[in-house]
Every structure is written in C-alpha cells, then in structure tokens.
C-alpha cells in the first residue's frame, strides 16, 4: 500500500491542473534596516529625474522638428508628373538613339554549338 501512495503523489505533480502557490513572507518593515529604504528612495528619485530629463529632451526635439517642416518652394520640380496623361511610346522610341546589339551577341552560344563540340562526332 505504501508503494501506491508514493506513486500517486508523483503522478499528482505531473498533471495539467493549477499548482498551489507557495506561501511568501509578506511582513512589512520587520527586520529591515533603514539603509535599504534609503536605497529604494534614492532609486525612485533617480528614476523620476531620468524620466523628467527624457520628457524634456523629447519635447524640445519635437519642437525642433516642427520648425523644420517648412518646405522650400524652389526645390519643387514642375511638369514631371505623368498621372492621367497618355504617353505615345512609339514616338518616344523614335527619339531615342539606336542601340548597338552586336556587342551583346558576341559571347552568346546557342545550345546546338555546345552539342557539336562535346559530341566529337
């Protein structure tokens, strides 16, 4: 019987059920010295000072960005949009210089040429 009791305890720990939380000591102020409280206060002050600095710095940065938003009108290029326009690509192709395709074809080998060289027949 004792062997069965030990195995049931082990199988109970392996289930999917909720586990029972271990009790924690929640006493406040007993046995603590004042130096740890001072450390907590100083950390809180440091954190507050850091947050204040970051908030101030970010606010100044946003104000600078707001003043940079003005657009210089001389940088705007007019007449280059093609939305809604009909483009005659045939006429545009006539205006372009003829391309020299001979240079691209010099290194091209067709599949038939490779077969003749490899076969040796």
Curated annotation (Swiss-Prot):
It comes from the Eukaryota. It holds the Pfam family CHZ. GO terms for cellular component: nucleus. Residues 98-121 have a biased composition (Acidic residues). Keywords: Chaperone, Nucleus. It is found in: Nucleus. The keyword Nucleus applies. Its main location: nucleus. The keyword Nucleus applies. Residues 1-45, 62-121 are annotated as: Disordered. InterPro entries: Histone_chaperone_domain_CHZ (IPR019098). Disulfide bonds: none annotated. Belongs to the CHZ1 family. Forms a chaperone-bound H2A.Z-H2B complex that acts as a source for SWR1 complex-dependent H2A to H2A.Z histone replacement in chromatin. Forms a heterotrimer with H2A.Z-H2B, stabilizing the association of the histone dimer. Also, with a lower affinity, forms a heterotrimer with H2A-H2B. This is Histone H2A.Z-specific chaperone chz1. It comes from Sclerotinia sclerotiorum (strain ATCC 18683 / 1980 / Ss-1).
């Amino acid at each position: 019987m004792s062997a069965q009791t030990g195995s049931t305890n082990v199988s109970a720990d392996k289930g999917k059920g909720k586990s029972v939380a271990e009790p924690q000591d929640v006493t406040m102020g007993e046995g603590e010295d004042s130096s740890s409280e001072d450390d907590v206060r100083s950390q809180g002050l440091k954190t507050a000072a850091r947050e204040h600095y970051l908030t101030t710095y970010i606010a100044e940065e946003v104000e600078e960005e707001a003043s940079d938003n003005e657009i210089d009108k001389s940088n705007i290029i007019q007449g280059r949009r093609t939305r809604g326009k009909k483009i005659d690509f045939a006429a545009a192709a006539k205006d372009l210089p003829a391309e020299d395709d001979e240079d691209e074809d010099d290194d091209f080998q067709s599949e038939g040429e490779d077969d003749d060289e490899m076969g040796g027949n």
